[in-house]
Amino acid sequence: MTERQIYTVSAEIAGRTLTLEAGRFAEQADGAVVARYGDTMLLATVVCAKEAREGTDFFPLTVDYEEKMYAVGKIPANFFKREGRPTTTAILISRLTDRPLRPLFPKGFYNEVQVIITTFSIDMENDPGPLAIIAASAALAISDIPFAGPVGAVQMGHLDGKLVVNPKMGEIEKSRLDLVVAGTKDAVLMVEAGAYELSEDEMLQAVIEGHAVCKQICELQEQLVQLCGKPKRPFTPPVVDTSLEEAISAWMGDRLRKAVRSPVKQEREAQTEALKAEVIAHFTADEPEEEIPNRTKEVSKAFEKLLKDEVRNAILDEGIRVDGRALDEIRPISIEVGVVPRVHGSALFTRGQTQVLTIATLGSPGDEQKVDDLGIETTKRYIHHYNFPPFSTGEIRRLGTPRRRDIGHGALAERSLYAVLPSEEEFPYTIRLVSEVLSSNGSSSMASVCGSSLSLMDAGVPIKAPVAGVAMGLITGEDGRWRVLTDIQGIEDALGDMDFKVAGTANGVTGLQMDIKTTGITYEIMRQAFAQARAGRLFILEKMNAVISAPRPELSIYAPRIMTIQIPVDKIGALIGPGGKTIRNICDTTGAQIDIEDDGRVFITAPDGEAAKKAISMIEGLTREAKVGDIFLGKVVSIKPFGAFVNILPGKDGMVHVSELDEKRVENVEDVVSLGDEINVMVIDIDRNTGKISLSRRAVLTGETPEARKAAGAAPRPRPREEQRGGREEPRSLREELRGPRRDGERPRPRRRDD
């Protein structure tokens, strides 16, 4: 057995070492690279099928990002102690890795390719997302799989007014920008970002500076290829039968143009499918029966190529889109809010034939989503879910768990709105948005952004500004010409070269996602796309503001009411009670839900304000500390010749001296109060040593404040000896309790030292 050869290359990126290593792991994979940045370490493997599956007419690329709990020194908490289904983070990183790799495989290459990225170590400082792209690209680059890479990837932040390369995880939480850019040495391939209203120029500058770092990472991968790269397997793109295309084009005449140029998706699809059926029937009529299936595929492929050319050439040559719009024109928009009864907020956003209904639901802090990514437990108080049912495109498909696409679109809409949400201190509710795509003809994710902003305002959530989104497209020609399209629809997305989604407020960008189908785009194209996106966004915001321009002043009557109080940390146990008995009693009595934070904040979520106030009263009764000047409605629990003892808080009594019972002189305590009476009393003094509380009914009756009493020279009355000895009555000793009361005439027994 030959000795294993290990190859390593390294470079300094943003003050940390990026290392790529091949030859140590997974030798039977077509390509395997370990990428390490700091102490974050990933293994990427790639395997390609030897032949394409028969009948396959698409590129079957699969990218899986596998999170392993051992990477953070944890054991899975489930019953089987094994990793389960992919987390949302794993799915998003899988999609993030797939998008810049896919355009770099040759056209017509239909062999199945599987990329698996496995987490070996996560250091909680360096984001594994960009590193996953680098590792996968390097594995493909050194393999024999046809691939026009390598691809570099980098994360960009914006801290203290400056762009930062690969900010650490703790820093990204404070950053105004979280952007991942990937590209080859020649062009940008993919951008994904969330931002706090950055300008288009700032976003583009972040992409440009990030791409410069990507070039360095590409050079590092090229060094690894020189050390251990395999020769690429031969691949010959399928030969296109242009004569068949020419024959079909001549036979159809201008019928394809007429069929394509219909503003209604269903009509356009019906007309093109009918024409396609005629073409297939005509060009397979003379074929032997056994050749008809193959001939049908050839004719169908040629027809689809002509359809694509017709759509693209009309845009490049004439500036005409299939629905007759100008290149920068947005489809007709209609907006409704409050369309669903009893929900907390709702909005129906329709743009062309894309229609999204977004529902907002407000919940208690206890409704926050608990997230456990690689053993790091966090919570999310804002959640966005995106649903894309089959009827939205007139199709039949099995329903089940959300697909990767649904999760990705939901995450994009979620981060696009994050910048305008109120803080937990301003608005302590948990917020869930659900976008139901009811009809789709392109840009449903951006329609979800618009619908979400509208539904939040309808629900009364105090967002900082409305947010709108629009998707831009791109058509390029072989002669270098290009056209950017505003508000692309389905056919333009499918047959175009770019999907460039921009969301934001009137002040700046809050969300960005760019995917392309070519080998890269230039900064000039991106600058034009940003400019058209801003114009489109402002147009849409104007339409939205005409319906609802600010959050409603009141929450829905069906939304819960949340009130917040602060209790001493040492009172948390008293509020919870033994085994949670006390807090459960409050919840059962009032119908409220109570959530307690470690810092003593208590959130009371109730169906109405009265229930919340009742719960607060009960909580304060358990946790409130008496202070001088506080007024309580107390209950008389004991009467003595020198005054009355009044219970003001659970387990806390104070004494009202006879001189403090009334404005006038009181000879007999029971002339003023009786046992069980409820009276208003003010705390006038708290003994620093014993904690005993002096109360005054007279101060409440006269409206006298503690400050006024002090200025007038009034002092708390001295406590009588009986009260000073310890409360209502001095407790008897155990011997006295056992001895019982003395009989009449019995002399007291002398006390012993041990009594």
Curated annotation (Swiss-Prot):
Biased composition (Basic and acidic residues): 719-755
SMART domains listed in its UniProt record: KH (SM00322), S1 (SM00316)
Reactions that this protein is recorded to catalyse: RNA(n+1) + phosphate = RNA(n) + a ribonucleoside 5'-diphosphate
Sequence ranges assigned to domain KH in this UniProt record: 560-619
Positions bound to Mg(2+): 493, 499
Organism: Chloroflexus aggregans (strain MD-66 / DSM 9485)
Protein name: Polyribonucleotide nucleotidyltransferase
Protein localization: Cytoplasm
Keyword NAD in annotation: no
Phylogenetic lineage: Bacteria, Bacillati, Chloroflexota, Chloroflexia, Chloroflexales
Gene Ontology terms: biological process: mRNA catabolic process; RNA processing
Pfam families: KH_1, PNPase, RNase_PH, RNase_PH_C, S1
EC identifiers of the protein: 2.7.7.8
